[in-house]
Amino acid sequence: MSEYSLFTSESVSEGHPDKIADQISDAVLDAIIAQDKHARVAVETLVKTGVAIVAGEVTTSAWVDLEQIVRDVICDIGYTSSDVGFDGATCGVMNIIGKQSPDINQGVDRAKPEDQGAGDQGLMFGYASNETEVLMPAPITFSHQLVQRQAEARKSGLLPWLRPDAKSQVTCRYEGGKVVGIDAVVLSTQHNPEVSYSDLREGVMELIVKHVLPAELLSKDTQFHINPTGQFIIGGPVGDCGLTGRKIIVDSYGGMARHGGGAFSGKDPSKVDRSAAYAGRYVAKNIVAAGLAERCEIQVSYAIGVAQPTSISLNTFGTGKISDDKIIKLVREVFDLRPYAITTMLDLLHPMYQETAAYGHFGRAPQTKTVGDDTFTTFTWEKTDRADTLRAAAGL
């Protein structure tokens, strides 16, 4: 981080229209994968006033009640009345899902599972930094925490005048690659019309901002912009059209690391846009956890229908304890980055994805979860269970 003195990242709440779309896409994926672990799923969602449109390509033996899934997601987020601008119980739901192209399928499936080809060409990045306990950049971590707290305060009734749509933005100050302060905080939250601006600002500052952000990083010079337009009553899909895959920087590292451009939500693990990005995070986090570097960004690329990555590259930004070339060699020895191996290594064939679709795919704690008869661990790419192996192999 020494190249920056200030760095800013943003996040959005689960009620943001693009995040509604992401959550619907991943809820559909979860429902299918719960019944058919070998399904091929690529689901896109659009939400706008009074309607949700679900499209894409799915090949599966499962049957799911897509309309009910869509309605449940919208209502669970908090859009349950036309008063807030969107009602999951009464909105229109359009299903225009087709089957996956056999041309793609023949390039992915193999007689030997380990030879499974990548579902598409592409490049993916993984990143980790030791600036927070979760080995994520601080600006995106704080931004996620703000909108998570907004949802918590709304759903618990702590701030009953809050509505689902919200956005956050945090600017951190760095010295010598370390976070030394927070320069600016932006939090815009949808709200009921009857609340005064003074009450809203006080409630948000005391029960959201100060509850989340470390006091030692705030100062008299920190700028706080709470609903800077003064009013945010119209929000959600009424205010803006929502689309799956339009918040890829929020989903990843807040702009601190590069992004290959492929979105995550709605895609089963055969799509390397998702699974290889998760593997990249797993590799980078274990490198940092092992003490091989303070920061690490890894790039991996694939060709459609080919199992082995076409390239693996890595940058520790001058923070490595050993050379980047040596770390790449260790990565190739310790991690198998073929698509099937990633799916096996991270145990990805479970209905774990809706939870990833809001508040970031990275920096989240693995949890044990049970769906029906299936018990599994979520956010497996956040484990640091290969750090000791890397450290030993590096001779540290």
Curated annotation (Swiss-Prot):
EC number(s) on file: 2.5.1.6
Manner of cofactor binding, per the entry note: Binds 2 divalent ions per subunit.
Binding site for K(+): 44
GO biological process: one-carbon metabolic process; S-adenosylmethionine biosynthetic process
SUPFAM superfamilies: S-adenosylmethionine synthetase
GO cellular component, one term: cytoplasm
Location relative to the cell: Cytoplasm
Catalysed transformations (reactions): L-methionine + ATP + H2O = S-adenosyl-L-methionine + phosphate + diphosphate
Keywords: ATP-binding, Cytoplasm, Magnesium, Metal-binding, Nucleotide-binding, One-carbon metabolism, Potassium, Transferase
GO molecular function term, any single one: methionine adenosyltransferase activity
Short name of any one Pfam family annotated for the protein: S-AdoMet_synt_M
Chain sites annotated for binding Mg(2+): 18
Metabolic or biological pathway: Amino-acid biosynthesis; S-adenosyl-L-methionine biosynthesis; S-adenosyl-L-methionine from L-methionine: step 1/1
Region span, Flexible loop: 100-110
Cofactor(s) the record lists: Mg(2+); K(+)
Primary location class: cytoplasm
Binding of L-methionine, residues: 57, 100, 240, 271
Summary of subunit composition and partner proteins: Homotetramer; dimer of dimers.
HAMAP family in UniProt: S_AdoMet_synth1 (MF_00086)
Family: Belongs to the AdoMet synthase family.
Function, in words: Catalyzes the formation of S-adenosylmethionine (AdoMet) from methionine and ATP. The overall synthetic reaction is composed of two sequential steps, AdoMet formation and the subsequent tripolyphosphate hydrolysis which occurs prior to release of AdoMet from the enzyme.
Protein name, UniProt field: S-adenosylmethionine synthase
Gene: metK
